[in-house]
UniProtKB/Swiss-Prot annotation:
Name assigned to this protein: Large ribosomal subunit protein uL24c
Annotated source species: Cyanidioschyzon merolae (strain NIES-3377 / 10D) (Unicellular red alga)
The family this protein is said to belong to: Belongs to the universal ribosomal protein uL24 family.
Cellular location(s): Plastid, Chloroplast
Highest classification ranks of the organism: Eukaryota, Rhodophyta, Bangiophyceae, Cyanidiales, Cyanidiaceae
Annotated keywords: Chloroplast, Plastid, Ribonucleoprotein, Ribosomal protein, RNA-binding, rRNA-binding
Role noted for this protein: One of two assembly initiator proteins, it binds directly to the 5'-end of the 23S rRNA, where it nucleates assembly of the 50S subunit.
GO molecular function (one): structural constituent of ribosome
Record-linked SUPFAM superfamilies: Translation proteins SH3-like domain
Length: 75
């Protein structure tokens, strides 16, 4: 029986900097076999001001990881 990962499931990260962490699936891209997990694979992006008078920002967001790097967590 194959366990399919769905939006809202808890997954365990098997490799990378976040190895051993558990998070909730936010977005799934089945065509690219990638998913976005809450709190996992976060990167910092520096945004320049686009208009005069605007202030630049530093944004932290989750980026997708490959499905082979996670396993469904039943905890």
């Amino acid at each position: 029986m194959k366990n399919t990962i769905k939006k809202g499931n808890q997954v365990l990260v098997l490799s990378g900097n976040s190895k051993g962490q558990i998070g909730e699936v936010l977005v799934i891209d089945r065509k690219r076999k990638q998913l976005v997990v809450k709190g996992i694979n976060q990167k910092t992006k520096h945004m320049k001001p686009k208009r005069q008078g605007e202030v630049g920002q530093i944004i932290r967001r989750e980026y997708p990881i490959h499905m082979s790097q996670v396993r469904l967590w039943n905890g």
